[in-house]
């Protein structure tokens, strides 16, 4: 509805009741009408003064702004036209440190505030009736709301609009955050190859060469891809042979010796520089030699390499000798010739097989479940190592050897004196783990590293009357495998000064976090009844990707 700013009184000139006792009514009405006209003229003159006074104030402020702008233009024109760089030196610091001009535009808002209320409207407001004094009941309310707002609330509609605008702004910010997170979680799309333009001339040239010499469409597409993305990398095109399937059903260990030699000869002829020369014979190691270097065929390359086996490698190396192997050195009776031949020619077992019962010649633990099978390894593979230092919680025990493929020490009982005499004197031979476990299998490593608790490892003895059985060590002398080793703490004791410093640092971080949260909350509290600020805030959120006040995401690293 239209808002009447100025009301001219009286509105009706002749609408007056004549008093009784007046004889000349026409003269009375004329005088009343003239008086009302004079009152209207006085109201017009008063409002004219207000209107022209407002116009004068606006013109004065406008002239002041124009004069200040003219003075700035005059100063700039003088400095531009009359500046002589030879006489007056300009420092680069003055030019760079000077702030750029920034105009301050004051928007007209809060037009209906008490301070900006015009005088005619103030007079009209004063004429209105006062609302009931409901503010007297405000101190007696528990919710803290003003009692008069339940009767009349001029800011109700503005508060409703403000709440809706702020909620829309927050919803848009959350949607942007979700979209950004979705873009981060989405996998990177491959680059699309642009489609080659349709060239009829190339097609006619391809047909002109004949069907035999015409290039295939796949070759043309490959050329276009090379032009767009650069030359393709070189891929290995070697044939897939038995060497590529070491762990499958076509393992080298499952082949006869004649086929194995033929396959190795072909590999040498394809790889070596001098293919006609025979391969070098394997080094002959005696019973006392240590650290032999086996010939290893890698399943990843299919080539012959002379390098030691590494248990951490991802390949499955197979030990193959190009010539018939020499007679093996004397072994303990735990590894018989039949078990050695079975380990050289049989296929490797699956990764986690059920523990098979040990053979008749192998060791067995009486009155306990059968332990894992012993390790079946070719002669000369295990590297004897010096005995490690025994832990302080266990009584001194015989030296323990360490296997090269398995990076764990297995405490077992030493061999009898009769078996030790046939081995090199300086380091004792490596005792062999239970049968059926491969050194490269992770299950074997876990089994060797953590033997079953409550079970003692079986002593490695040879069947015969001259080999006495050693009694198992008492339980008090054996440390359980599941119990971790306890070492004295070597960390320095934190003094009171350091603890106070750490506490101060924590408090400082907490204070900084709380301070930044208060700054973020202050940003929300600054939004008062300012329409321009609310609208500009919403526009900034819609058309920008910044999330300055996004639920304190920037202080998560302090937690």
Curated annotation (Swiss-Prot):
Gene3D superfamilies in the cross-refs? 1.20.5.340, 6.10.280.150
Q: Which portions of the chain have biased composition (kind: Low complexity)? A: 333-346
Note down the stretches annotated as region Disordered.
170-202, 273-400, 412-491
Free-text note on domains in this protein's UniProt record = Binds the Arp2/3 complex through the C-terminal region and actin through verprolin homology (VPH) domain.
Tissue occurrence: Highly expressed in brain.
Q: Superkingdom, according to UniProt?
A: Eukaryota
Q: In which broad location class does this protein mainly occur, judging by the first location in its UniProt entry?
A: cytoplasm
Q: Point out residues bearing the modification Asymmetric dimethylarginine.
A: 341
Question: Basic and acidic residues bias located where?
Answer: 182-202
A single Gene Ontology MF term assigned here is:
small GTPase binding
Gene name, please?
Answer: Wasf1
Residue positions of the PTM Omega-N-methylarginine?
A: 341
> What is the species listed in this Swiss-Prot or TrEMBL entry?
Mus musculus
SMART domains for the chain: WH2
Residues annotated as domain WH2:
497-514
What the protein does?
Downstream effector molecule involved in the transmission of signals from tyrosine kinase receptors and small GTPases to the actin cytoskeleton. Promotes formation of actin filaments. Part of the WAVE complex that regulates lamellipodia formation. The WAVE complex regulates actin filament reorganization via its interaction with the Arp2/3 complex. As component of the WAVE1 complex, required for BDNF-NTRK2 endocytic trafficking and signaling from early endosomes. Also involved in the regulation of mitochondrial dynamics.
Task: State the InterPro entries in the record.
Answer: SCAR/WAVE_fam, WH2_dom
Gene Ontology cellular component terms for the protein in this record:
cytoplasm; cytoskeleton; dendrite cytoplasm; focal adhesion; lamellipodium; mitochondrial outer membrane; mitochondrion; postsynapse
Annotated protein name in UniProt: Actin-binding protein WASF1
